[in-house]
Amino acid sequence: MSCQVPTVPASPVVKFPLLPRGLLSYLPANLSSILPVARGAASTCEASSTTTTTMPPEPPASPPPPKKMSPPGAGAGAGSKKKQQQQADAAELARVFELFDRNGDGRITREELEDSLGKLGIPVPADELAAVIARIDANGDGCVDVEEFGELYRSIMAGGDDSKDGRAKEEEEEEDGDMREAFRVFDANGDGYITVDELGAVLASLGLKQGRTAEECRRMIGQVDRDGDGRVDFHEFLQMMRGGGFAALG
C-alpha cells in the first residue's frame, strides 16, 4: 500500500529539538552537491504494511519569486513587505523540503531524514528521529509531507526572537564566567572576598603603579566597597570591572 497524503488541518506547532535553530535558513543553495537527489526511487513510510511502486507525484511547486521592492518613498507599505517575506519563506521552504525529500515523492521518510542529517554532520539515533516524525506527523502515515514540514519550519523560524534572547543570555553567562575567573585570581584564599593584602599582592605581580602601599589599596577598595566591610565581594568586583577595573580607581 503506497503512502497516502490526505488533506488534514495543519498540525500544531512543534519545536524540533534536533536541529539548531536557523539551520533551515542557512542551508546553501548548492546543498544538492552534498545531498544528491536520487529521483525516481520509491519511498516506504513506516505506517505502510506493503510497498507498491508508483510514479512519484510532482514535487511541490515553488511559489512565484517576490516582487521587486519599491524604492524608498514609493509607497510600499508594511503589508507588501510582509507578503514578500512570506513568499521568500515559502520558496525557501520548498527548496529545503526538496533537498530532504531524496526521491522526490513529496514525503520525507525517517530514512531520508536520517541520511540527510548525517550528511550535514548531525547524526541522530533512529529512535529519536522516529519520535520526532511521530510528533509532527499529523496524518499518521509515518512520513513528513510538505504541510507538516512547513509547520516544523515555521516553528523554528518563529523562535528567532527567542534565539536572540538565548544568545544574549549565553553571552552574559560567558562574561559572568570570565569575571569569576578574574575574581579568583585576586581572591587568593578563596573565601569569596578580595582583601587589602590580596589586592596589593596581585597589583604588584602585574607591575601596576596603583596599590603600591596598603593605604592606597585600602582607598581603592573603599571606592567600590558598597557594604563597608573593608573587602570586595564578587558583585562589587563585577561593578568595578564594568567601570574600568582597579586601574580606573588610581
Swiss-Prot record:
Residues at which Ca(2+) 2 binds = 137, 139, 141, 143, 148
Q: Where does Ca(2+) 4 bind?
A: 225, 227, 229, 231, 236
Please indicate if the UniProt record lists Calcium as a keyword: yes
Where in this chain does the record put each EF-hand domain? 88-123, 124-159, 174-209, 212-247
GO molecular function terms attached to this record: calcium ion binding
**Where is this chain compositionally biased, Pro residues type?**
56-69
Keyword set, alphabetical order:
Calcium, Metal-binding, Repeat
**Gene3D superfamilies membership:** EF-hand
Q: Where is the composition biased (Low complexity)?
A: 45-55
Q: Which residues bind Ca(2+) 1?
A: 101, 103, 105, 107, 112
Q: Does the keyword Ribonucleoprotein apply?
A: no
Q: What SUPFAM superfamilies is this protein classified in?
A: EF-hand
Region called Disordered, residue ranges: 45-88
What is the superkingdom listed in this entry's lineage? Eukaryota
SMART domains assigned = EFh (SM00054)
Q: Which residues bind Ca(2+) 3?
A: 187, 189, 191, 193, 198
Relate the protein's function as given in its record. Potential calcium sensor.
Return the protein name: Probable calcium-binding protein CML22
At the highest ranks, the source species' classification is: Eukaryota, Viridiplantae, Streptophyta, Embryophyta, Tracheophyta
